[in-house]
Swiss-Prot record:
Residues 190-253 are annotated as: Leucine repeat I (LRI). Pfam families: GRAS. Residues 12-55, 103-145 have a biased composition (Low complexity). InterPro entries: TF_GRAS (IPR005202). Residues 411-517 are annotated as: PFYRE. Residues 183-601 form the GRAS domain. Interacts with SCR1. Residues 365-401 are annotated as: Leucine repeat II (LRII). This is Protein SHORT-ROOT 1. Residues 520-601 are annotated as: SAW. It comes from the Eukaryota.
Amino acid sequence: MDTLFRLVSLQAASEQQQQQQQSASYNSRSTTSSGSRSSSHQTNASYSYYHHSSNSGGGGGGGGGYYYGGQQPPPSQYYYLEPYQEECGNAPHHQLYMDEDFSSSSSSRHFHHGAPVQQQQPPASSTPTGTAPTPPLSTSSTAAGAGHGLFEAADLSFPPDLNLDFSSPASSSGGGTASSGAVGGGGGGRWASQLLLECARSVAARDSQRVQQLMWMLNELASPYGDVEQKLASYFLQGLFARLTASGQRTLRTLAAASDRNTSFDSTRRTALRFQELSPWSSFGHVAANGAILESFLEVAAAASSETQRFHILDLSNTFCTQWPTLLEALATRSADETPHLSITTVVSAAPSAPTAAVQRVMREIGQRMEKFARLMGVPFRFRAVHHSGDLAELDLDALDLREGGATTALAVNCVNSLRGVVPGRARRRDAFAASLRRLDPRVVTVVEEEADLVASDPDASSATEEGGDTEAAFLKVFGEGLRFFSAYMDSLEESFPKTSNERLALERGAGRAIVDLVSCPASESMERRETAASWARRMRSAGFSPVAFSEDVADDVRSLLRRYREGWSMREAGTDDSAAGAGVFLAWKEQPLVWASAWRP
């Protein structure tokens, strides 16, 4: 079973169970399973139950669409875990989750429509991934101690009020909202959103029995190697589990350490290039931002005297510099006279607890390659990487020495998916950071952010709490919007990448870490609190910036870029009546705006 929690390894137990099952009938297995559940309810200890689907238990009854609604699941094997608090509350974190290997433990199939559906298997990777040890399997119950307060022993049958439709695949084209997929409706195959939203409501209401039932169901259906719905269930369930056990930061440290062990320059390069090749998600912002920066620099060069021009880009983006080769080439070919000097200072931000050794190795290699490419293009070039740990608002911009060429140096600030790295708080930190960018007096500031409303209201408002409004209502609002956004992202990867792809798996794991951060961490600690274009535009205007419309040449470049990709991607300009009030352009997937690109000047 591709179980999300990875609390117990079922490999050895499965082999032993298979030998015992050869002489057992279908009914005897059902009776045994029911008896195990019944006997467990008579103990005083709290146990967490995890269901292991048997391929021989296939079914679900009848033809047509397969619904979970009031009927018992197929015959299956049940395993006892140690008392919940002992395993989940006090166990070392590497026992709660297998790092990022997510290797299948015993079953690789789920049953939809009463028939097995083969899941996507993890691709063979040239970079080995470690496997954390798992706690021992307990074959008998004990009555020692009370369990975790959130999970009391409960009947793990399917709740009778759930009516989930698996008859059609999920699609993000409908533009779902936070309230879509209400439990009880058909849902058009969006069973993950239905179950996850209901589970989030139960978590907010502290309904421990229903939480346990729903998490058991989700654990049965989730898989990081399945379809979009199974992946959403897998990653959001991991986030919910970390939230319930107050282990969000610990979980992120474990996932980050696993990613760090398996990160190299080659793997990073392959993933970035493959992502750009098959999806415009990142290259859309790169093309728009480069166009605005280049036009700004060329304006300076045209109006300047004969002295050598110096341009400096402050890159506040963790894009591994994939944006800059095309800009270097454009500077070399479009400069009328002497090629200007270009300096790039890139700030690589990371969470305080995240390992940075692998990223530092990658950035050293990137810097060497960038300098070599600039020499080939004939562009005088200087590259510097600054590694920053923690909140981007704590970065001392004045210490970066951005005017090494004196007052004649033209400065551009590039912010690609970086402003959300400023953690919301009571001191209006995001507004303050935008104001600090204004004090640099740049020629242009490019802002590219993913379009999602993942803050409760205005986390920087004076009336907000230090946690950014972490109430039950705020949690549900952010959870629902996160489902919408990451569903569209996963759907775009599903339709753009091959079924088996190491690069796609790496991107999905990155999204999984973002989901865990969003769901399990309070707003005051989360690095994934995206905002809408309207919010960012308001902040930039308040800081003293005015929007710069992209020229028709830049817009044509973006449209030409999108024609290289599969159908479903489109560009939408922000009109004057738009939420962004005429600032920038949007990248849309199946009519859903997902990425916003804009340019600003003082």
